[in-house]
Curated annotation (Swiss-Prot):
ATP binds at residues 318-324, 339. Belongs to the AceK family. InterPro entries: AceK_kinase, AceK_regulatory, Isocitrate_DH_AceK. One of its GO terms (molecular function) is ATP binding. This is Isocitrate dehydrogenase kinase/phosphatase. It comes from the Bacteria. Bifunctional enzyme which can phosphorylate or dephosphorylate isocitrate dehydrogenase (IDH) on a specific serine residue. This is a regulatory mechanism which enables bacteria to bypass the Krebs cycle via the glyoxylate shunt in response to the source of carbon. When bacteria are grown on glucose, IDH is fully active and unphosphorylated, but when grown on acetate or ethanol, the activity of IDH declines drastically concomitant with its phosphorylation. GO terms for cellular component: cytoplasm. One of its GO terms (biological process) is glyoxylate cycle. It is found in: Cytoplasm. Pfam families: AceK_kinase (PF06315), AceK_regulatory (PF20423). Keywords: ATP-binding, Cytoplasm, Glyoxylate bypass, Hydrolase, Kinase, Nucleotide-binding, Protein phosphatase, Serine/threonine-protein kinase, Transferase, Tricarboxylic acid cycle.
Amino acid sequence: MTAAMEQLVAHTILQGFDAMYGRFLDVTAGAQERFEQQDWSSVHLALKKRISFYDHHVGLVTSQIQIMLGERYANRSFLMAVKSSYENLLLDYPRYEIAESFFNSVYCRIFEHRNINRDKLFVHSSQENRIPTYPTQLTRIYHAHSGLTSLFDRVLDDTPFTQVWEDKQRDTKLIINHLKQELGAAFNDETSLELIREPFYRNKAAYLIGKITLNHDGQYQTIPLVLPVLNNSNKQLYVDACICHVNDASIIFGFARSYFMVYAPAPGALVRFLSNLIPNKTNAELYTAIGCQKHGKTELYREFLTHLDNSDDQFVTAPGIKGMVMSVFTLPSYDFVFKIIKDKFAPQKDISHATVKEKYKLVKEHDRVGRMADTQEYRHFTFERHRFSDELLAELLAVAPSIIKVTSDQIIISHLYMERRMIPFNIYVEQANDDDLRDAVDEYGKAIKQLAAANIFPGDMLFKNFGVTRHKRVVFYDYDEISYMTEMNFRKIPEPRTPEDEMSAEPWYSVGIYDVFPEEFRTFLLINPKVKALFNELHSDLFEAKYWQSLQQNITHGQYEDVYPYRGVHRLRKT
């Protein structure tokens, strides 16, 4: 092989990445029009379409390389030389970090995810110390020298929206009053604001995101600022809320939310700004939140390696009731769990491995409304053998021997998911005090209702299939039985025809495969007397077929419930 061929292959991979990211940006650029035209059905289609580009272009490039090289493509030493040529192409390249992940994906596709190590892939970036830059001005800076009203007038005037504001003067006043209430005397005419030029679009909202620098008697403090903008029935804009605390901003970038549409020709610079804004979010979380989820996967793996290097605990079975379809393990010191699909499922689970994988794919592409955990899917994931106890390894080999390979120093799992670790809801309920229990039951009911309004029926609603986040939000994480709401047939149980019907252990009525009887939910949800009382008070409508039928009608008519990632206390107009 000649150096010219190595360079040609490197150029082919980078051109494939450019084609992919160009399409990614094209779909992202359409977010403003979809928002302004209130084309909500297209919002969901665009998200799904954008997610598909990455794997599609990896496949195209892989095929090109295989055709170019014939049988020679399996020469690993040649591809290491290609990697060296590729590194040279990235020296001044604005999206170098994501381009490295794309190279990894092509390499793994060619070699079917085998023989992955630090030499052959960009396990770590080739430019770890490079500070990413933006091709244009990333932010605008505003000062309050002419007063806070003038500052926020300019902020709203500078947005790229083509629509008029419903009442800009009112919104400016509400923003200022809210910030004064939250920040006190530190929010004054010495305040400055740095705002990202591009809005962040998700579902029915556009988010203006930046940071406020406060100057109180010479003491400087920087805090986040998030202004969600909504679109009224007359297609006029208004600022719905004002968020200025790190934890609240963090929730907006949460792992149970759909990916943002934000136009970012150099995402590394955007992530760098956001990481200063929300320091409790990792690079993996931020790249994923802005739609670069495949690079988020790379960053998550890098963060995992760093955690391994700085810990010595052993993997254990994750807390909670063991699943019928999946086995879950974790490190006690780590914030994620590893989920593997068992070789054989419990008899009552009449599904295939392919179906389980399709359900996880559905969740990634769907609007998760803050109630379904995102996952990252890995193949041929390698662990150090000494970090596993003999007991855990034996358990995993007992349930999934076909996907686990054990050597003297490694455990290689051919397919797994990584997911944010949460407290299983059934455990949380057992340990909660009365106030936390009430909040938890309310959160659980809201989770089911918001999922249903987004056209997701959880299927198995047992408490063990939900988790509680560090922000005490309830999130669903068991996807093997989810379906679209529109596929289900919600029915009221017919009245018994005879006394014998009433006493019968078997139903006296026909039951179709998609039939659901909400009255039966009480049987398995309301075992705990305290939970039963709270559920009947807060969410008794979940046991009525007509409630579910009304949600189905809304979905059929294109009416989707508004679910926003901030609490009512942050809204500028209280309702």
